[in-house]
Amino acid sequence: MHMDYHSPYFFGYLLGLIHLLGVVAALHALFTVRTAQGAIAWAMPLFFIPYLTLIPYLIFGARSFYAYIKARRQANQEMHVAMANLNWRPWVEEALTARESESYAALRAMPKLGRMPCLANNQVKLLVNGKATFDAIFAAIEKARDVVLVQFFIIHDDTLGKALQQLLLRKAAEGVQVFVLYDRVGSHALPASYSQQLRNGGVQIHAFATRRGWFNRFQVNFRNHRKIVVVDGLLGFIGGHNVGDEYLGGHPQLSPWRDTHVQISGPVLACLQESFAEDWYWATRQLPPLILPDAYPDNGVLCQALASGPADPQETCSLFFLEAIHSATRRVWITSPYFIPDEAVFAALRLAVLRGVDVRVLIPSRPDHRIVYAASSLFAFEAVRAGVRMFRYQPGFLHQKVVLVDDEVSAIGSANLDNRSFRLNFEITLLTVDRNFADQVEHMLIKDFEQAREITAEDSRDTHRLQQLGMRIARLISPIL
């Protein structure tokens, strides 16, 4: 049978097929997208203009994680077998000690959100910029004797990236086992030669991709946004920095870059290793070595590693922000490069204001993604009208992800206050319960607020109508950003 492509019937059939596929995709969105806003944001355009939205939905909308969930369960089973010979008794004792401490109550429901428990007797150190962070990371790797685990969302082949590469090659030549994991989407500009040089030198390096096979080239919605470094199971790092010169202030338009990391030692490092192991297993079907000390110091602070992702049975990251805001009795200060709260988190912020809580949110004054910046600006204006104190950091680009609740609880990690971190990305955050550490975080944030300009109601009124239109369009698609 010969198809006449010039026949008017052909185009009619083609349009009919596209609309049929649009209906099917719209139904798929209604059944799979977790929020009503996101489902409507996809379903309506798919139903009415499928010829414009089918391909974007294929790229950004697919939400099938059955393979990942199955692999993670298999990884957990294999990890339990592999870890059976390790001495977990000291670690379990720290979990029990944490539950019995007075500070534990300050976390409220937070310990129940994740798979990993709250643990006592950890040591934490605040790293308030890129130089302090990478000086500490490089110094720790220099002293490595057994195993180095490195995971970043972005690795660039620039001055900092090359310095890390050479250091890892040198340690591998000394006999240290080195494992490097990066996100395929976040590190899309990383040349294959960078990874190949590491492999040639004995470093095990792999990309994390949430779907296997050729389709992953087109499906970019789900990203592993975690930043983890663990050295010999004794020293670890977690926070907002990636590997690139811009994180040291090397990007003129965004410099100076403002970000925060934490250096950690203690039993919570087992949780960072477990998170890395799960992601590594998904990428390689193999498990890296896990190192547990035979004993921990008797002095330290309560910490919990909260790993979250789209394969979780509940929306762990979103629920964390909700509980952190709801638990505040005196203050909740949040810094995030993006401010796109869902309805529940936005309502929690408004309620906190009504309770008399000092609610402050610090966001950038410069955009790195213009659509997200526009949507964030509109949400910021609405938050100001609700009584939330919104600030824009002036010196450079603000990328840190920090939450401070009252006088004891702080959270530092990779999660932004936006829908992508809530429901699409794999994130990890370190919760710490300690008055002294919270004081350090407070001192750091006060300095940041001193270098910020508070957003006022006049800023909204002074915004041009065309800009306001752009912001509202950006907000319409914010559930899928």
Swiss-Prot record:
Gene Ontology molecular-function annotations: cardiolipin synthase activity
EC number(s) stated in the UniProt entry for this protein: 2.7.8.-
Keywords recorded for this protein, A-Z: Cell inner membrane, Cell membrane, Lipid biosynthesis, Lipid metabolism, Membrane, Phospholipid biosynthesis, Phospholipid metabolism, Repeat, Transferase, Transmembrane, Transmembrane helix
Domain PLD phosphodiesterase residues, every copy: 220-247, 394-421
Task performed by this protein: Catalyzes the reversible phosphatidyl group transfer from one phosphatidylglycerol molecule to another to form cardiolipin (CL) (diphosphatidylglycerol) and glycerol.
Record family assignment: Belongs to the phospholipase D family. Cardiolipin synthase subfamily. ClsA sub-subfamily.
Protein name: Cardiolipin synthase A
UniProt source species: Pseudomonas putida (Arthrobacter siderocapsulatus)
